[in-house]
Regions:
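Extracellular/periplasmic bilobal clamshell ligand-binding domains
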Residues: 306-343
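Early extracytoplasmic/lumenal segment of secretory-pathway proteins
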Residues: 22-87, 343
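Mature extracytoplasmic/periplasmic domains
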Residues: 260-320
């Protein structure tokens, strides 16, 4: 065997041994954003911990965790809805842990309840659920609260995605917490009465339908707006010129927000590395990245970031009820939706 060949084999063996020696964090993520790649790469660069990732939607991740049971390799779980995080906690898929860093940096209403052993999940970024309106068909004062969306003046103007989609279930869960079940159900009936068409599509579809005049009013998460605002597409820019944006309930409880959050899996094998990763997500660098890279607001307050779309949307008053209540209210909300015929 030649010297060159022996050297190459030795180098390959050394690389393989080093790769095996490098600590690995198994991440199950429902965040399907290519921009998150840099977030993970920066963590590995800073810590030497390699991330092995499984991507699926939230429901798929929860189903997989249940099927795998104690044999699951998952260390960290990332989900994109507070109700789903709450549901996973109630089903025993997470474990509590104490972190002075996360307790200090993540506001209490954006994390799971601490029963004395620590919270089981933490929110790391937020998105607001806002109202968009056609500037030629609707006045902003007619949609400056969620309650007004159900007013008779808005009959035939409203477009939404399915009422049973998690984004809407969470909004309706929050409204139920604020108004109480009886008034909330009457409000949902008002939404159904005001539909311009049957619920369909995603949030971007609602924005475009409002711009086209098919609808006068729509409901969307803010990061969908920010994507269109930052787009170089002439068509996307034309859409944004035709719509206005309202952050509802600025004179009362504030605009509804939801979170993307993380937890340590119940049967995690690398708990220390998992906690290190979650604490990294609360760092200034990672928090700014959520804003700059994916158009989400940081969960940590007072941080500087550079996102022209979020800056243009401006500051707003957000609700401060514990985000976990949207999960607690989800069953009753779905029952209300069924009764009023909101599909």
């Amino acid at each position: 065997m030649s010297f060159v060949r022996r050297a190459a084999l030795a180098a390959g063996l050394l690389w393989a041994l080093c790769a095996q020696a490098q600590p690995v964090l198994n991440l199950y993520s429902a965040r399907h954003y290519q921009t998150d790649e840099a977030l993970y790469a920066n963590f590995t660069k800073a810590t030497g911990i390699r991330i092995q990732r499984v991507d699926a939607d939230d429901a798929g991740i929860l189903a997989r965790l249940k099927a795998e049971g104690s044999a699951s390799p998952a260390d960290v779980i990332l989900l994109v809805d507070a109700a789903r995080l709450w549901k996973a906690e109630t089903e025993g898929l997470f474990q509590p842990f104490k972190s002075a860093t996360l307790q200090k940096r993540i506001p209490a209403h954006l994390r799971g309840k601490d029963d004395g052993q620590g919270s089981q999940w933490f929110g790391f970024s937020t998105r607001a659920r806002v109202v968009v309106y056609n500037k030629t068909a609707v006045q902003p004062g007619d949609v400056d609260s969620y309650e007004k969306l159900a007013d008779a003046r808005n009959k035939g103007k409203l477009c939404t995605r399915s009422g049973s989609h998690p984004y809407n279930l969470s909004l309706f869960g929050a409204v139920t917490e604020h108004l109480g079940p009886q008034k909330a159900e009457a409000w949902m009936q008002g939404l159904v009465n005001n539909m311009a068409r049957a619920p369909k599509g995603g949030d971007t579809d609602q924005i475009k339908a409002v711009a086209s005049g098919e609808c006068g009013i729509g409901i969307t998460n803010t990061y969908y707006l920010a994507r269109l605002m930052r787009s170089k597409s002439v068509d996307d820019q034309a859409v944004m010129e035709k719509i206005g944006v309202v952050f509802p309930n600025q004179n009362s409880w504030g605009t509804h927000i939801n979170i993307a959050g993380g937890a340590i899996a119940k049967h995690a094998k690398n708990v220390e590395a998992a906690q290190q990763f979650l604490e990294y997500l609360a760092s200034d660098a990672a928090q700014a990245y959520f804003a700059n890279g994916n158009n989400e607001w940081p969960a940590v307050s007072g941080l500087d970031f550079s996102n022209p779309a979020l800056e243009k949307l401006g500051k707003f008053k957000s609700e401060t009820i514990p985000v976990s209540v949207v999960g607690m209210n989800q069953v009753k909300v779905q029952q209300m939706l069924d009764r009023v015929g909101y599909r």
